[in-house]
Structure formats: structure tokens, C-alpha cells
From Swiss-Prot:
Domain comment (free text): The cytochrome b5 heme-binding domain was proven to bind heme, although it lacks the conserved iron-binding His residues at position 73 and 106.
Gene Ontology cellular-component terms listed: endomembrane system; extracellular region; membrane
Gene name for this UniProt entry: Cyb5d2
Molecular function via GO: heme binding
Signal peptide (from-to): 1-22
InterPro entries, alphabetized: Cyt_B5-like_heme/steroid-bd (IPR001199), Cyt_B5-like_heme/steroid_sf (IPR036400), MAPR/NEUFC/NENF-like (IPR050577)
Main location: secreted
The keyword Ligase belongs to this UniProt entry's keyword annotation: no
Record's miscellaneous remark: Non-classical progesterone receptors involved in extranuclear signaling are classified in 2 groups: the class II progestin and adipoQ receptor (PAQR) family (also called mPRs) (PAQR5, PAQR6, PAQR7, PAQR8 and PAQR9) and the b5-like heme/steroid-binding protein family (also called MAPRs) (PGRMC1, PGRMC2, NENF and CYB5D2).
Family to which this protein belongs: Belongs to the cytochrome b5 family. MAPR subfamily.
Designated name of the protein: Neuferricin
Biased composition (Basic and acidic residues): 231-241
TM stretches of this protein: none
Keyword presence, Secreted: yes
Length: 263
């Protein structure tokens, strides 16, 4: 992946993701008079057992028919606790106890809420949407509650954070690293290190990020303008080497592609 082109791809994906999110929000959280509304007691009948009318589950208040995945959700199956209820929190926490199988998502981080959003995408793609659950996320009129609106805001925040992280990774790809009891540690850069394909190699540096307890090794471009000054014709042709959040590794030549740290 070319350096400038790579960043362009990330930005294009960000725009596309935002557009998809906007469409999803209109469908998932908008008003649709024909949508069936469930109350919790009614949904609880859809556990997939003998005599039950079906096999449904809810996620963030949206109800899905998961009969096609019966082996996963029917009584006795690993995910049977999700059937007949909204257990949104457990999709993130992995707590399948009765205390954990709840719809309360308060206290979850933006990244965890984004994980729920990804699960919602999965159910939209693989199962049939059948209605909305009256309660925490939808009112008796079928419209979103303030809590669902907060979830929407956190999804947007989580997507923005992901996009920022991807841009940062394009600028400062992680180093390759290995350790052995015989040779000690080795850090090095390549055109594919960190899973970021690019037209430059870079040199190892410590990157200090705000809020992080320890720095981590990244590969830093050594030529051309700084990433945040691409249009500056008077740059010093040192790439991002002068970024104030970077530090050289003691004992490693400044422009070495590989750093060795013997035992």
C-alpha cells in the first residue's frame, strides 16, 4: 500500500462507513408504523422449546427470528440464554449467567458499544428482523428512547476512534519483534511490518501516546515531508523523525532498520 494512497484508502473507508451508518440508523432507529412491537413477557415465549411459537432474540431492542440458527440458540444450546430476551450486555461481557443476560449497556465503553453495533450488523445480515422490543431501547410507540439515542452517539464515537486508530497505524506501523533466551530481543521494520503494506520501510522508534503507561515500538518514515505537513515545500526531508512523541532506542543506530538488544 502506498503511503499517500494508503491514507486515502483509510479516509475513503471512513466516509463509506459513515454513510452506511447513516443508512442503518434511519432503518434501525426510525419510525415504521408497520413494525411489530413486543413486550418482554411476549418475547419470553419465543425460546424455541416444545410448544413455543418460535425462536427469537433481541439485541438493542431489535427482535430477530433465529430459527435458522436453532442449533446455537435452542434449549440446551450454548447460546440458549439469549433466546426470548434482550441480553445485549452479554454480547460484550461474555457473562451468560442470569445476572449477566441483561439489556443494560450502561458503563460500556465506546469500543464495546461498537462491538454491539457489529453484532447488530451480523444479525441484520444473517437473520430475519421481526420487530422491536418495548422497554429500555424502544417506547410503547415503537420510537427510540433516550438510552438508544445515547447508544447511537457512542457508536459514532467508536467509529471515529477506529478511523483515527487506522490513520495512526498508517503513519506509524507497529514494528516486528522477537525474543529468544539465546539472543535477546530484536525489533525491526519492513514494508509489511504491523500488517501495513507500504512503499517505505522505516526505522524503529518508541512512540509515547497520551494516557499510555508504556511506549510501544513503531516504524518511522525517514525521508520526505512530515505526515502532517505533506504540502510543505521547505521540509527537512526527515519524514516523521522529528515528531516530539518519538524517542530513539538506546544502543541502536538512529537510522538502523533493525535494533538488537542482547541479554
Amino acid at each position: 500500500m502506498l503511503r499517500i494512497c494508503g491514507l486515502g484508502v483509510v479516509l475513503s473507508l471512513a466516509v463509506a462507513a459513515a454513510a452506511v451508518l447513516a443508512v442503518w440508523l434511519m432503518d434501525w432507529w426510525g419510525s415504521h408504523p408497520s413494525i411489530r412491537l413486543f413486550v418482554p413477557e411476549e418475547l419470553a415465549r419465543y425460546r424455541g422449546g416444545p410448544g413455543d411459537p418460535g425462536l427469537y432474540l433481541a439485541l438493542l431492542g431489535r427482535v430477530y427470528d433465529v430459527s435458522s440458527g436453532r442449533k446455537h440458540y435452542e434449549p440446551g444450546a450454548h447460546y440458549s440464554g439469549f433466546a426470548g430476551r434482550d441480553a445485549s450486555r452479554a454480547f460484550v461481557t461474555g457473562d451468560y449467567s442470569e445476572a449477566g443476560l441483561v439489556d443494560d449497556v450502561n458503563g460500556l465503553s465506546s469500543s464495546e458499544i461498537l462491538t454491539l453495533h457489529n453484532w447488530l450488523s451480523f444479525y441484520e445480515k444473517n437473520y430475519v428482523f421481526v420487530g422491536r422490543l418495548i422497554g429500555r431501547f424502544y417506547g410503547k410507540d415503537g420510537l427510540p428512547t433516550s438510552e438508544l439515542t445515547q447508544v447511537e452517539a457512542m457508536v459514532t464515537k467508536g467509529m471515529e476512534a477506529n478511523e483515527q486508530e487506522q490513520r495512526e497505524k498508517q503513519r506509524f506501523p507497529p514494528c516486528n519483534a522477537e525474543w529468544s533466551s539465546a539472543k535477546g530481543s530484536r525489533l525491526w521494520c519492513s514494508q509489511k511490518s504491523g500488517g501495513v503494506h507500504r512503499d517505505w520501510i522505516g526505522v524503529p522508534r518508541k512512540l509515547y501516546k497520551p494516557g499510555a503507561k508504556e511506549p510501544h515500538c513503531v516504524c518511522v518514515r525517514t525521508t520526505g515531508p512530515p505526515s502532517d505537513q505533506q504540502d510543505n515545500p521547505r521540509h527537512s526531508n526527515r519524514g516523521d523523525l522529528d515528531n516530539p512523541n518519538l524517542e530513539e532506542y538506546t544502543g541502536c543506530p538512529p537510522l538502523a532498520v533493525t535494533c538488537f538488544f542482547p541479554l
